[in-house]
Amino acid sequence: MPSPLNHHLSCFVLSVILLGSHVSTSKIPIAPQSVCEGLIEPSVLSIDKPLENIKANRGDSLVLRCAFYASPQPTIVWYHRGKRVDSHPAAHFETLLSATNLGQSVVESALRIDCLDERTAGEYFCEATSPCTQPVVTSSTVTINKAPKSITGTCKSIRQPLESPPIVSDFTLSRIELPGGVAQLACRVRGVPTPKTKWFKIEEDESLSTIDGQPNYMHLSNGDLLIVGDEETISESFRCVASNPLGSVHQDASVIYMMA
């Protein structure tokens, strides 16, 4: 039987969804400073997986990946030669609850370079920001191997691709949460046509069961998964699948419930 706290959180979450289910979560306000000051444990934001310098052939498709250890979850912005090229708003439900303890997460972001040439080569930055800490940045220099264009290919034919396969571009890989707490797992995707996302729970025998219709899980309109803990579960794992006509990809996430 759910505890009164769990019931309260469930009602709060449900009211937010009903009132704003068709509103982008990018419009959810950043946590006020009072939330940061009220935390029992200080918030954290550090690089978990830095970007690496890459050399590749002209015409290659590349994926850059960075990851951050954070509490609360960060907003992640990508830059190429100083110009913003992609961004992912933070998962903000945890700060809306005004909790004194926030879960700790590892969040990974990916940026796809569809075709490498002089226009897409250069320096890339992956920046994470949080309302409670200073920003952190990791960078990568992407260079082209010296070889004749006739050998390595050209990007002219795919400069503006009409279609592209799905990629999970922002994802909560792991989460440490208090028993009975509310956790938001990010699953943001890119691709043309826009990929559809679907969440599954990974059972102990590694089979997949849909979260649809289960009271403690809610698939948000931006692709994220909202979880209301039941105070009895020790850990659980989930899979986000992103699909469009060009294919499908998936990422797995784990949540561990621990007392502070």
Swiss-Prot record:
Any coiled-coil ranges, and where? none
- Note the InterPro entries from the entry: Cell_Adh-Cytoskel_Orgn, Ig-like_dom, Ig-like_dom_sf, Ig-like_fold, Ig_I-set, Ig_sub, Ig_sub2
Major subcellular location class:
secreted
Summarize what gene deletion causes: No visible phenotype. In a zig-8 mutant background, 74 percent of animals have cell bodies of ASI and ASH head neurons displaced either on the top of or anterior to the nerve ring. In addition, double mutants show defects in the positioning of the ventral nerve cord (VNC) axons characterized by axons of embryonically generated PVQ, PVP and HSN neurons from the left and right VNC drifting into the opposite cord (axon flip-over). Both defects begin at the L3 larval stage and become more pronounced at the L4 larval and adult stages.
Gene (name only): zig-5
Q: Where in the cell is it found?
A: Secreted
Q: Does the keyword Transcription apply?
A: no
SUPFAM superfamilies for the chain: Immunoglobulin
- Domain spans labelled Ig-like C2-type: 42-143, 166-256
Q: Name one GO biological process term.
A: pattern specification process
**Species annotation:** Caenorhabditis elegans
SMART domains according to UniProt: IG (SM00409), IGc2 (SM00408)
Which cysteine pairs are covalently linked by disulfides here? C66-C126, C187-C240
> Under what name is this protein listed?
Zwei Ig domain protein zig-5
Q: Name one GO cellular component term.
A: membrane
Alphabetized, the UniProt keywords read: Disulfide bond, Immunoglobulin domain, Repeat, Secreted, Signal
What exactly does this protein do? Together with zig-8, required postembryonically to maintain the position of ASI and ASH head neuron cell bodies and ventral nerve cord axons of PVQ, PVP and HSN neurons by preventing their displacement that could occur during body growth and movement. May act by reducing L1CAM-like protein sax-7 (long isoform) adhesion.
Region forming the signal peptide: 1-25
Entry keyword Repeat: yes
What does UniProt note about where in the body, tissue by tissue, this protein is expressed? Expressed in PVT, VD1-13, RID, AFD, ASK, RIV, RIB, PVQ, DVA and RIS neurons.
